[in-house]
């Protein structure tokens, strides 16, 4: 490819709309352009990167025995109604009607469609197991699209679905996909960790997320420094912290003007934060759920939803709170209205251990002190509903844990029979009895993997692509297009690299050398061959983008040298 023919409109200034490195650099490098909120066009360089990621995925899917299909983006509403997810999925689902008033959605995922696709075709246990996968656009109407490709309304996803005769078979399929995903992300050259995860709206109770570790990640991950345990913080179950014994006092009401937050209490009343008991209230499908945690802890809303059930989780309104005797800013179980089917109180196990603590009185400007929840909170439900912190220990081995950020680039789910039962998708077993398929599903965010790679691998000059996913593996850069000797050597090297199957770009633009160097660093080609004044002496410069290593190499044999260098870098996943 010649740079003079390449459509790659680079930008000199940082785009104001970009909040994270991947978004900024893909716009600057001429890989991506925004069309509307959460909607992007991939330009040739960006599309090449996506295709390289897709080809790595395709190779490993074929190796695993999965078979590629393609299903429609537009899906009929009735199959989503069969599983009950038409209303459950919420406003993130794009819904539409055709001219005949039939309802459809733009697929956010394809569990329903794939299950209906096989339910009348796979009839016998002899046809199983089967794993079908596709590379397809997905659509989710994000309330706040942001961070470029990391949270967009349209994205490319690889999704696979396995069908087995029993749970043992499903676990085997799950492990096959888990191993394939590990190979995929290793070859893509990103630092990742598989972590235990919640299944969310997909369902099932067996799941791992593949997290690309990056500061820009929206997910919090806990990792044990001793045994290697790793989990999404929503899935990690912290231990109950036991408070030290002390003499108990009777709870007493006291005035706390302008103390509507935990921080206000700490600063004005001078109470230690671990002695405060914080209230967070949710509206879950119209049910009021009051949760209580220690003041320095955060509520795990996923754990709360898993305990209570329901689909639509919102912050409770002041009107709903007051209808149940709760005063916003001063809430607690004390003086609250009676619990019933529409009102439940959940207290975290660690909060229940507090002695002589401070919590709200459900009266504006007042709190109770010397509160001991185990004694004073009546008829409440207790459970572990807080997020793990670095002050906790590993739930597996008791070792030290660290929190870090991650970008979810893939997830594997053991679905069980959730979809096959609701969609009446069955096969005949060895005894001729109808049984529901035991399913798994497995997703990789292709475009998100591209963004995650940049989040991990960039510097102040631009992107640092691994060889496996770079838009071009190497660039030949003649510094002066008016010097015939330089141009002749550059074209010769370019042709030799093409003959060696190197994916190479010749920067034949009539631009200053500095402009070409800046663009090469911005776009992030792994290897740069600079053809300059020493070309007449039979020498060119070879530079590795990742390490900034430079070396002068004789022109004779330089193409073979670069090809070997690229092979070595790729073997090391660099």
Give, region by region, the residue ranges found by the protein language model.
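TRNA-binding/sensing appendages of the translation machinery
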Residues: 1-98, 110, 161-200, 297
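Short acidic loop-to-helix transition motifs that present clustered carboxylates
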Residues: 75-79, 320-321, 508-515
């Amino acid at each position: 490819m010649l740079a003079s023919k390449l459509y790659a409109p680079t930008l000199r200034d940082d785009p104001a709309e970009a909040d994270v490195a991947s978004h900024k650099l893909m716009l600057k490098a001429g890989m991506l352009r925004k069309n509307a909120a959460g909607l992007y066009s991939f330009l040739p360089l960006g599309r090449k990167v996506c295709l390289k990621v897709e080809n790595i995925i395709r190779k490993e899917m074929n190796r695993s025995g999965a078979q590629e299909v393609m299903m429609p983006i537009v899906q009929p509403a009735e199959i989503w109604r069969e599983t009950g997810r038409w209303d459950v999925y919420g406003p993130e689902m794009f819904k539409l009607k055709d001219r005949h008033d039939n309802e459809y959605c733009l697929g956010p995922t394809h569990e329903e469609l794939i299950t209906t696709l096989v339910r009348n075709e796979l009839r016998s246990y002899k046809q199983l197991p089967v794993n079908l996968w596709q590379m397809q656009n997905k659509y989710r109407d994000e309330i706040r699209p942001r961070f470029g490709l990391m949270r967009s309304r349209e994205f490319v996803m690889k999704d696979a679905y396995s069908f087995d005769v029993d749970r043992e078979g499903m676990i085997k399929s799950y492990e096959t996909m888990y191993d394939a995903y590990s190979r995929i992300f290793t070859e893509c050259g990103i630092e990742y960790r598989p972590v235990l995860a919640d299944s969310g709206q997909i369902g099932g109770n067996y799941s791992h997320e593949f997290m690309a570790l990056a500061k820009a990640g929206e997910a919090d991950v806990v990792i044990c420094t001793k045994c290697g345990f790793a989990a999404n913080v929503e899935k990690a179950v912290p231990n109950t912290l036991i408070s030290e014994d002390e003499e108990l006092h009777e709870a007493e009401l006291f005035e706390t003007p302008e103390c509507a937050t935990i921080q206000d209490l700490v600063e004005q009343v001078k109470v230690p934060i671990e002695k405060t008991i914080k209230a967070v209230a949710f509206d879950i499908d119209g049910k009021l759920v009051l949760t209580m945690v220690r003041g320095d802890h955060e509520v795990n809303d996923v754990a709360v939803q898993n305990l209570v059930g329901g689909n639509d989780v919102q912050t409770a309104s002041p009107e709903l709170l007051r209808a149940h005797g709760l005063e916003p800013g001063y809430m607690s179980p004390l003086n609250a209205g009676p619990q019933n089917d529409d009102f439940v109180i959940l207290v975290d196990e660690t909060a229940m251990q507090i002695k002589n603590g401070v919590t709200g009185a459900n009266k504006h400007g007042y709190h109770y002190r010397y509160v001991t929840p185990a004694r004073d909170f009546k008829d409440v439900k207790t459970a572990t509903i807080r997020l793990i912190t670095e002050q906790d220990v590993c739930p597996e081995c008791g070792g030290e844990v660290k929190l870090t950020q991650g970008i979810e680039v893939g997830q594997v789910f053991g679905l069980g029979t959730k979809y096959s039962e609701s969609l009446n998708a069955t096969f005949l077993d060895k005894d001729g009895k109808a049984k529901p398929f035991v399913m798994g599903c497995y997703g990789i965010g292709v475009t998100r993997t591209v963004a995650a790679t940049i989040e991990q691998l960039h510097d102040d000059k631009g992107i640092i692509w691994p060889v496996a996913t770079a838009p071009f593996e190497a660039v030949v850069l003649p510094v002066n297009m008016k010097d015939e000797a330089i141009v002749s050597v550059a074209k010769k090297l370019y042709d030799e690299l093409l003959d060696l199957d190197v994916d190479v770009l010749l920067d034949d633009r009539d631009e200053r050398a500095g402009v070409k160097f800046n663009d090469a660093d911005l776009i992030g080609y792994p290897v740069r061959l600079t053809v300059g004044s020493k070309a007449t002496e039979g020498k060119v410069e070879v530079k590795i983008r990742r390490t900034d290593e430079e070396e002068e190499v004789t022109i004779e044999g330089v193409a073979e040298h670069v090809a070997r260098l690229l092979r070595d870098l790729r073997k090391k996943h660099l």
